[in-house]
Amino acid sequence: MKSILLFFAFFLVATSSWAKAPFKYVWGTAHHVLPETHSDESGYFSLCEGNDGRIYVGTSKYGHNAYIVEFDPVTAKQRIVVDAHKVCKLNAKGYAAQAKFHTRNHVGPSGVIYAGTKQGYRQKGDTSEYPGGYFITYDPRNDTARNLGIPYKKQGIADVVADESRGLAYIVTCEDQHWMLYDFAAKKFSELGPMLTPYATTLVDGEGRAHSLTKDFQLATYDPATKKVTQRPIEIGGKAFTRENGSAIPTWNLSADGHTAWLILMNDAGLISIDLSSKGNKVKGVNHGLMLKGENPDSRSALTIAPDGNIYTLISVKNTTGFGKGKLHHLCRYNPKKRRHEDLGVLAVKNPDFFDFKPANGKKPPWSHGYHTLPDGTMTPLHNHMALIATRDNTLYATIIYPFTLLKIDAFRKEPPAAGPAEKYLRSIHQHLDRIEENLPQFTELGEMTAERYERGGLVGFHWLGATLEQELIGRSGGLMHIGFDRPWKDKKLRSEAEKAQDMALVAWDADPKANDLKRLQQFKAAGQFVLGFGSRGNPRLAEHAKTCDAWVDLNTEPKDSDPGKLNHVVGAVSGWVWMAETLAAHTRKGRMPTMWKSWAMEDGRDWSDRFFRKVKYHKNFSVAPIPKGALGKAFLHRIRSQLLSLENTQLPTLHDFADLIAKETKAGRRTVVASSGHMVMHYVGKYSDSAWADNIEVHENVESQLNSFKTKAPQGGLVLRLGYFGLSPKVDDLFKLKKSRVLLMTAENPRADFASHFNYPDRLDLGMAFGDACVPIEGYPIALFPPSGIIKAAAYESLNVEILHRLK
């Protein structure tokens, strides 16, 4: 009898493992969203891809707080980037807490992420009142979250969409669905009028009109040009589109044509398109049939339009296959061009050990009931998916609850074309960023030594050997204020010999040293200065220079540095700022906070300088907690990676267009003027392989001699590449008009109206820096630190150069 039972047990196990599913699987890699950011293993529709390719997930921590978590697809690391209560300066608990990020996380062209918070659920005995949801932005460029206020008192926020070009944002509240308008310039909320359907979202079409669905499923349209709202019924197949029940919650997105909205309801698997540009009193809609057949369809914020135009949805249906029980979550696809529906398969988890469902204590973790195992041993979601997005490369991400999971689906990822010159160059920079991060202990050691010398009265400065790093580190937004031998915090005449003995000289090389550089180094040493050098040990002509220096940061570039594809100036700048970051961190570990520069582009930038420059060595009014070793350098590297990724992800088509135009100009025998501005440009523009096509003329709007130089030297009607900073000043704009220049503009945003003329130039590449430049915030200090602009500009310019030279071969 015992042997028979053993046989049947073996038979059951064997047949289970041999069982074949009657459907295909779509495999995904599961990642448990940071557990400290949610209370019930739950989240909602809050999911997006940033310009930097990172994934941003909103969470829900009922009765406590809400967070946005950044997920890095390359490393699979996660970190909190928005703490709702922290950014809004709240400490409420219970029903009064900001318990959810429910919004879909809108990403503007700038890369800023727009979101909003929502209330949770009132528990028995909780008498607290919910104040209303907060409109919150997160800017990956400078790792900064902002609170823009409560749009409607006692109402949460269900949706936020920004129209950055017009300075507007559209907000849908909940639990009553008010449609709100936010004016960024006026910093004011106003109500647009019609009440909307539950969990309505706003689409902004190609003409700038905003659309949403009213409570009775009419199309509400706001035209910012006329500031009027219209309502029209939607007609599908000769019948009015109506909301049949409370579960008819729409998810829609806008196609690339700028006027077609694709929509699915939570409880209906039918796919609908709506022509937002419809003329007349009715809006035209088309029912394209069922995405999936099955009982009790359920699709939750799970319609996304991929870059190739295909529409993907997640729909769960009752499992009636006889193969397991519960629900099955199908990934479906519709090709609008071929008018073809596909059931791609049932979601399945590649790595079922991503969460400890069966801990050693034998107790099943709470809120871990959202997955089950099918007869063939495959783990699949049981209850609810909550969001779906397609990224630039067609990777799909879904969120699943219980436990709260980010599921990465790469089965439909598009293989990118072979990397071109610019991509190869940018990726070589990333390799150096990784190497620098591995070498952080050296930077920390150098930073601690620098901070100690500074504390003892030493000055840190440059002797101007003609390298980019000398210009890059001095007088920059978010940089040390008193760096430079001519920039002490007290009268130089009052310095003691002991203080002078602590002086530290920074020297650097972008290329081969000049004939007298070694002799000058020896003179610095003889004067008693500690000499820190930056350069490539691979360059044999720097061997003696490296030996002469007291310390050396190896840039680890090729002996002659790739040209085209020059790296020394970029890698040197990154290394210099990481050294400065670790120097500042070392100060904080001693309870000190040195004075730092605030950008003069900011309204109060000069006032800030007047308060501290040449006057204050350490702040007395700002208290900064000790920053761990390596943390600040790593944070800066994280921001540089983010901005370089954004540049590659969003600006390469424009960069290629620029390269085409400049190469054509060069082949016609005409030079291109680079009207450059910035700290490093004079040492690299027109100096190396780019001299084949570029003539550098420095043009800073506040230097009259440079404006006159451009007037004299730039050809009338010539092609001009403006390598700028933030926006375009009126003086430089007038200069281009005077010379009738054909301008290719490389610059970043500037909210000041007097610097907004860059919007008038159709050929514009966005360098992607946030206004104010500095990109690393630290707790307790009112301004961000360390500017990325010099690095990003140099990287963008050399990326353009390698593309131009490739075309000139």
Predicted regions and their residues:
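Surface-exposed loop and turn segments in beta-propeller and other repeat-based domains
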Residues: H31-E36, V82-A97, G149-G156, L196, ...
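Beta-strand-rich domains and repeat architectures in extracellular enzymes and scaffolds
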Residues: V33-A66
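Repeated scaffold domains used in trafficking and secretory/extracellular systems
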Residues: E41-S46, K89-N105, K154-V161, L196-E207, ...
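Residue-level detector of Asp-centered blade-edge/turn motifs that repeat once per structural unit
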Residues: E49-D52, V107-S110, A162-R166, D205-E207, ...
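Blade-loop segments of beta-propeller domains
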Residues: K77-S110, K118
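Short, conserved, GDST-rich strand-edge loop motifs in beta-rich repeat architectures
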Residues: A115-G132, L314-H329
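Blade-level signature of beta-propeller repeat domains, shared across WD40, Kelch, NHL, RCC1
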Residues: D376-P417
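Glycine-rich phosphate-binding loops that contact phosphosugars or nucleotide phosphates
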Residues: M449, E455-T588, K667-R670, S676-H806
